[in-house]
Structures are given as structure tokens and as C-alpha cells.
Amino acid sequence: MKVLVTGAAGFIGFHVIQKLLATEHSVVGIDNLNTYYDVALKRARLTQIGVDPKFDFRKMDLSDRFLVRELFSAIKPDRVIHLAAQAGVRYSLENPQAYIDSNIQGFLNILEGCRHNDV
């Protein structure tokens, strides 16, 4: 089964991907690697997954509906595990648009990708 995991470089996404790969699923991991959390730590997590022919990482922003549409058409996932989100309550007061883009528009784009591709 091909599984799309958003938020792939985050703590939870990283562990979910490891479990999926251990159970013979193929995984496409998506993350925008934003700087809210340490990017070096995110890259280290992706490196720890290692070179696995069943894993494909793509850096992208889920708020771009055209990229998300192209992604779904290209990879044709069987399942989606959506873990991507802009975290941090205090930061939401400083930069509310980042939350709208990631947590609302990004989620809507994932839902639309699922809807249009029978996921």
C-alpha cells in the first residue's frame, strides 16, 4: 500500500514513517521544513530513515493547491496520514496567516486531493 504522510520530518511523522516502512508499505513523505522547529533536527530525522527504496521524501508547501493536486496525480496514494500543521499558540498571534495557510488551506488541499482521487 502507498501511504502519503504529511509532516514527515516532525516527531510524530518520523515515527509513523518508520513503522510503515517496517510493515512493507511504501511511503511518500511531505514536509516544508519550516524554521519554527530546528531544521537540522528535521533533516537528521529524514537522514535517520536512510535510503529506502520504499521511501520518497518531497519538500513542499501544502498550501499550494496546484502542487498538491499534481502530487496526488503523480503518486496516487492509497491512504493519507495528515500530520502537517503549523504549531505554536503564541506564534499564531504574531503570524496568523501562517496558520491559515498551513492548518486550514493545507488541510483543505489534502482533503480535496483525497476526494478527487478516491482516497
Could you describe each region identified by the protein language model?
Residues 1-119:
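N-terminal Rossmann-like NAD(P)+-binding domain of SDR-like oxidoreductases, especially those catalyzing
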